[in-house]
A protein has these predicted regions:
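Alpha/beta-hydrolase fold nucleophile elbow
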Residues: 103-114
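Alpha/beta-hydrolase active-site loop
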Residues: 80-100
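Active-site glycine-rich loops that stabilize anionic/oxyanionic intermediates
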Residues: 35-39
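Conserved alpha/beta-hydrolase
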Residues: 41-43, 50-75
Length: 158
């Protein structure tokens, strides 16, 4: 079963577009997908099907400035509004609350890819006690030449 959901974004400007996918069998838990920059949640349909086949509910939305949320709100791609990154994290929490209202007794997991991994990290620092776990995928690591690049930029700006 598929439910389409909408909710007012934390930015008080946009209607976030989301989906709740429910398996045919009794669900074992919930996985909320948090997509990356320039993506949309339906990019993950193959993964969603795998979770459904494993009897997990999947929740996903398109961030402000992304996918169907940007289209419905007539926004430019990447227009997050004020406090964009924080807005996306709080919007993920709003989706969590919608799902938990329907399915209150299931373990809840977040899966964040790329920029979504940073949103999940921020989420865990504030709401981590609401989660059974999280997967952080495609995140950044140490860049050995980053310090050198910063020094070059500082010299150019000075």
């Amino acid at each position: 079963m598929l439910y389409e959901v909408q909710f007012l974004s934390y930015n008080q400007r946009d209607q976030v577009q989301g989906w709740i996918y429910v398996p045919a069998a009794k669900p074992k838990g919930i996985v909320q997908l948090v997509h990356g920059f320039g993506e949309h949640s339906r990019r993950y349909l193959k993964m969603i099907v795998q979770y459904l086949d494993a009897d997990y509910i999947v929740a996903a939305d398109d961030h402000v400035g992304h996918g169907k949320t940007a289209i419905v709100n007539n926004n430019s791609w990447g227009d997050w509004g004020d406090k964009g990154f924080h807005t996306m994290m709080e919007d993920e929490h709003s989706l969590h609350d919608l799902v938990v209202e329907k399915y209150p007794d299931l373990p809840y997991f977040l899966y964040g890819h790329s920029m979504g991994s940073f949103i999940v990290r921020d989420y865990m620092s504030k709401y981590g006690d609401e989660l059974a776990g999280a997967t952080i995928c495609g995140t950044t690591g140490v860049w050995p030449d980053l310090e050198k690049g910063i020094q070059i930029l500082e010299q150019d700006v000075a």
